[in-house]
Amino acid sequence: MSKVHVFDHPLIQHKLSYIRDVNTGTKEFRELVDEVGMLMAYEVTRDLELQDVDIETPVTKMTAKRLAGKKLAIVPILRAGLGMTDGILSLVPAARVGHIGLYRDPETLKAVEYFAKLPQDITERQIIVVDPMLATGASAIEAITSLKKRGAKNIRFMCLIAAPEGVEKMHEAHPDVDIYIAALDEKLNDKAYITPGLGDAGDRLFGTK
């Protein structure tokens, strides 16, 4: 069964309060999402493997630690997931970035993939799928399903806020995928918006509301 990691770090919660605030403008919203993405990435990458390397400092020779094992790939779900990507890249600049685009079918209400561009060695990488919100879970589930169909195995999902309904659906669909969130909100409303939530993350990031 997948685990849900909820971050209670004071800096994350402080910045999240401004992200939620309806009075926060597009520029500040974008900067805050980027910053929280970076802060969350510290914890999401906590268990990356290290290996010993011999180096020489200006004073003496020593054995130091560097990242080893599987390389990292970040896969934002278009378009809102783009807002969290640069924050992670600021910590792990060598990571590759893939993209998955989804839209909701107006009749079936299911998420349908319309675009996917991934690193060629995606099967060999540890993957962080990013999207600011986990509401119904449909988009995240479809994105992860798409990655698995392409051979990806080591996948994590990272978002700012989640609804219990979305978390439950993710557990059912992908019990092997851990979920990392800044806040677990109360519920979905009758329009499938997370409550209290932050509104439409894509519109607020790109000023299109």
UniProtKB/Swiss-Prot annotation:
Q: Which Pfam families match?
A: UPRTase
What is known about regulation of its activity? Answer: Allosterically activated by GTP.
Give the CDD domains listed for this entry. Answer: PRTases_typeI (cd06223)
What gene name does this entry carry?
A: upp
**Protein's UniProt name:** Uracil phosphoribosyltransferase
Pathway membership, UniProt: Pyrimidine metabolism; UMP biosynthesis via salvage pathway; UMP from uracil: step 1/1
Q: Which family does it belong to?
A: Belongs to the UPRTase family.
What does the record give as cofactor? Mg(2+)
List residues binding 5-phospho-alpha-D-ribose 1-diphosphate.
Answer: R79, R104, D131, P132, M133, L134, A135, T136, G137, A138, S139, D200
Source organism per entry reads: Staphylococcus aureus (strain NCTC 8325 / PS 47)
